[in-house]
Amino acid sequence: MTHLFEGVGVALTTPFTNNKVNLEALKAHVNFLLENNAQAIIVNGTTAESPTLTTDEKELILKTVIDLVDKRVPVIAGTGTNDTEKSIQASIQAKALGADAIMLITPYYNKTNQRGLVKHFEAIADAVKLPVVLYNVPSRTNMTIEPETVEILSQHPYIVALKDATNDFEYLEEVKKRIDTNSFALYSGNDDNVVEYYQRGGQGVISVIANVIPKEFQALYDAQQSGLDIQDQFKPIGTLLSALSVDINPIPIKALTSYLGFGNYELRLPLVSLEDTDTKVLREAYDTFKAGENE
């Protein structure tokens, strides 16, 4: 079995203009990603501000992306919530719209235990019968999918990958011991750790920064797969990532996507844009990165 994708999947932002989803900007952004070697597009995830999107908006965004991508790369829909039945219904709708896979975050707020996680994820996978990417992000959910639980879930025929945003390499190694990486993919959920994540056998990354540098971030993965040492190649990307860490995702990345012309620099409350001085510094860091490419 091949993996859902290898290399860089982009956690897509949602462009707004006057607080409305800007479909033309969305299409322009997706075209930019496809032209610059993105290997998958993840829609309606954390970076998309999914908590503040309506159901109708999520479906419109997903349908727009699916139609535009036209099977050139996988489109993965973020459909997970802390309500199993709502997650099932959202996932069924995503499948009906043509999504290639779904991504399911661990339940948050009400949370659960590990047995509950197994039942939650398996119930959705059983109902939808579409490839599932588990999304483990304890910094946002205060809930983790333990390695033993990943092992159980990896045996389900439709649960095929883990987005690992733990930034914990001991966790990665424990998971690796328990799964078949030929059929179950491990994707980093942290752009800043990809060098070591790839060295330790990860199949790719679900990336924020790839919204603006997809080609360069995919080139990093390709170089690693070719057996090259990518530490030096990563350094300018690492500098840009440091600038991007000025605030909570997706606040900074939208300062850059808007800079590239993909919608206004707008977020929905409770998220707010960077201060003007921070926006200027971040955009200058992007300009410096791009200028370095041309030297």
UniProtKB/Swiss-Prot annotation:
Disulfide bonds: none annotated. It comes from the Bacteria. Its EC number is 4.3.3.7. GO terms for cellular component: cytosol. Its main location: cytoplasm. The active site is at 135 (proton donor/acceptor), 163 (schiff-base intermediate with substrate). The record marks 46, 109 as: Part of a proton relay during catalysis. It catalyses: L-aspartate 4-semialdehyde + pyruvate = (2S,4S)-4-hydroxy-2,3,4,5-tetrahydrodipicolinate + H2O + H(+). Keywords: Amino-acid biosynthesis, Cytoplasm, Diaminopimelate biosynthesis, Lyase, Lysine biosynthesis, Schiff base. Pathway: Amino-acid biosynthesis; L-lysine biosynthesis via DAP pathway; (S)-tetrahydrodipicolinate from L-aspartate: step 3/4. GO terms for biological process: diaminopimelate biosynthetic process; lysine biosynthetic process via diaminopimelate. It is found in: Cytoplasm. It holds the Pfam family DHDPS. One of its GO terms (molecular function) is 4-hydroxy-tetrahydrodipicolinate synthase activity. Is insensitive to lysine-feedback inhibition. Shows ASA substrate inhibition. Pyruvate binds at residues 47, 206. SUPFAM superfamilies: Aldolase (SSF51569). Catalyzes the condensation of (S)-aspartate-beta-semialdehyde [(S)-ASA] and pyruvate to 4-hydroxy-tetrahydrodipicolinate (HTPA). Belongs to the DapA family. Homodimer. In fact, exists in a monomer-dimer equilibrium in solution, shifted in favor of the dimer in presence of the substrate pyruvate; the monomer has significantly reduced activity compared with the dimer. This is 4-hydroxy-tetrahydrodipicolinate synthase. It comes from Staphylococcus aureus (strain MRSA252).
